[in-house]
UniProtKB/Swiss-Prot annotation:
Protein name: HEPACAM family member 2
Keyword Protease found: no
Compositional bias segments (type: Basic and acidic residues): 472-482
SMART domains tied to this protein: IG (SM00409), IGc2 (SM00408)
Entry keyword Disulfide bond: yes
Bilayer disposition of the protein: Single-pass type I membrane protein
Disulfide bonds: 158-207, 258-303
Region (Disordered) residue spans: 444-466, 472-491
Signal sequence bounds: 1-18
Glycan attachment points: 73, 117, 153, 308
Phylogenetic classification of the source organism: Eukaryota, Metazoa, Chordata, Craniata, Vertebrata
Domain Ig-like C2-type, chain residue ranges per copy: 137-221, 223-319
Protein location: Golgi apparatus membrane; Cytoplasm, Cytoskeleton, Spindle; Cytoplasm, Cytoskeleton, Microtubule organizing center, Centrosome; Midbody
């Protein structure tokens, strides 16, 4: 045996040194039982060759190698015992095994001989393993009902029906589980033992089983672990919380919520302390307190949480203080308007005021008259009516009231038509007198007895006007020059 091995080694060394090379992709090949397995082999040389010989040998541990088949050039010479199991297509040195069985597991040796000027030899060895693929594993938990934190233990077992050379690995939340003070594994890692269980052991567990030809993972399973209560706290939907004190305005209803981390969920009870006595006022996670129904301004409460599986209990205390700020709020609640209503009212008032101001400015009588007169051409003023002895003096003065506004020089424009003057009074003086009367028109008429008597005399004087009416008017004006109120009434 050792002689043959030494001879093969010398042949391989000589072949490698002489230029013959035999190569295989891998020295270990894994096969699946019942399927075909192909062992690829590549060889090459640089010298002329007349004959090429390929030989396949099979050996198991502690046994002699067996001849499987061989070829010279393109002729195959199989072992009659294995002629239907092994196939080779020369000059290709690769070997096909079909079907593969557990008995085919071992070392396969390929040897290549080249006959030319001399004989060159080289060989390679391939280890073949045969396995059955694993099936999907199933995880079982004991006890199935769960375990109590710090009290109970738990065992997870991975069950696989098929597969050879199985390797087990436990995963928690997708990461490998390692040995710790509470975690331990069986001999082949097929079981995971947790003792004692804690809240930190809660998670998604799975079992991964693999072998050289396959791998399968179980469905995720979450063990049941009872724990808690932890982190008991009380919150409210309103009011001011400072530490364990809630400040509430009188007249407001406040809702308290008590919660804690626990499995299964806790049962809650609310306890009120009054006059050194305590009594349960409600069961459940929520408590509503109407502040106006509380007789005391400061009341102590307590929320208790109890886990009926773990048997653990926790409680938290808090104080509710009723303030009197709410009384003023209630008194002003019906009287005060909302900010939106106030803003809306102010906006409407400003809009209406601006509209009224715009209309008042737009339709003022004196401005309308002034705008209309300013738009009239200058020729219309020159066509104004003159005094006549047969017209009413009041109507004449009324007409001059609209047209008598001064120009840039401060002198009112008079009609172009000449007007006769009174006796001894030139026409230029008449123009100045009429302008002064128009320029000093009062804004409002004054009523008194003297003015009434003067009106009668003025009317009588004006009724007698004729071609010399203007002279009489000037005479009347001369008589009443010192009486300012009478001149106002004539106008």
């Amino acid at each position: 045996m050792w002689l043959r091995v030494f001879t093969a080694f010398l042949s391989f060394t000589a072949g490698a040194c002489s230029g013959l090379k035999v190569a295989v992709p891998s020295h270990t090949v894994h096969g699946i039982r019942g399927q075909a397995l192909y062992l690829p082999v590549h060889y090459g040389f640089h010298t002329p060759a007349s004959d090429i010989q390929v030989i396949w040998l099979f050996e198991r541990p502690h046994t002699m190698p067996k001849y499987l088949l061989g070829s010279v050039n393109k002729s195959v010479v199989p072992d009659l015992e294995y002629q239907h199991k092994f196939t080779m297509m020369p000059p290709n040195a690769s070997l096909l095994i079909n079907p593969l069985q557990f008995t085919d597991e071992g070392n396969y040796i390929v040897k290549v001989n080249i006959q030319g000027n001399g004989t060159l030899s080289a060989s390679q060895k391939i280890q073949v393993t045969v396995d059955d693929p694993v099936t999907k594993p199933v995880v079982q938990i004991q006890p199935s009902s769960g375990a109590v934190e710090y009290v109970g233990n738990m065992t997870l077992t991975c069950l696989v029906e098929g597969g050879s050379r199985r390797v087990y690995q436990w995963l928690k939340n997708g990461r490998p589980v390692h040995t710790s003070s509470t975690n331990s594994f069986s001999l082949q890692n097929s079981s995971l033992h947790i003792a004692p269980v804690t809240k930190e052991d809660i998670g998604n567990y799975s079992c991964l089983v693999k072998n050289p030809v396959s791998r399968m993972e179980s469905d995720i399973i979450m063990p049941t672990i009872y724990y808690g209560p932890y982190g008991l706290r009380v919150n409210s939907d309103r009011g001011l919380k400072v530490g364990e004190v809630f400040t509430v305005d009188i007249g407001e209803a406040i809702l308290f919520d008590c919660s804690a981390d626990s499995y299964p969920p806790n049962t809650y009870s609310w306890i009120q302390r009054t006059n050194n006595a305590t009594y349960v006022i409600k069961h459940g996670p929520r408590l509503e307190v109407a502040s106006e129904k509380i007789a005391q301004k400061t009341t102590d409460y307590m929320c208790c949480a109890y886990n009926n599986i773990t048997g653990r209990r926790d409680e938290t205390h808090f104080t509710v203080i009723i303030t009197s700020v709410g009384i003023e709020k209630l008194a002003q609640k019906g009287k005060s308007l909302s900010p939106l209503a106030s803003i809306t009212g102010i906006s409407l008032f400003l809009i209406i005021s601006m509209c009224l101001l715009f209309l008042w400015k737009k339709f003022q009588p004196y401005k309308v008259i002034k705008q209309k007169l300013e738009g009239r051409p200058e020729t219309e003023y020159r066509k104004a009516r003159t005094f006549s002895g047969h017209e009413d003096a009041l109507d004449d003065f009324g007409i001059y009231e609209f047209v008598a506004f001064p120009d840039a020089s401060g002198v009112a424009r008079m009609p172009a038509r000449s007007v006769p003057a009174c006796d001894g009074v030139p026409g230029q003086d008449l123009h100045s007198t009429i302008y002064e009367v128009i320029h000093h028109i009062p804004a409002q008429q004054q009523d008194h007895p003297e003015s009434s008597s003067q009106d009668g005399e003025e009317d009588a004087c004006l009724d007698r006007h004729d071609e010399a009416g203007l002279q009489e008017l000037g005479h009347c004006k001369e008589q009443d020059k010192g009486k300012h109120s009478r001149a106002k009434q004539c106008i």
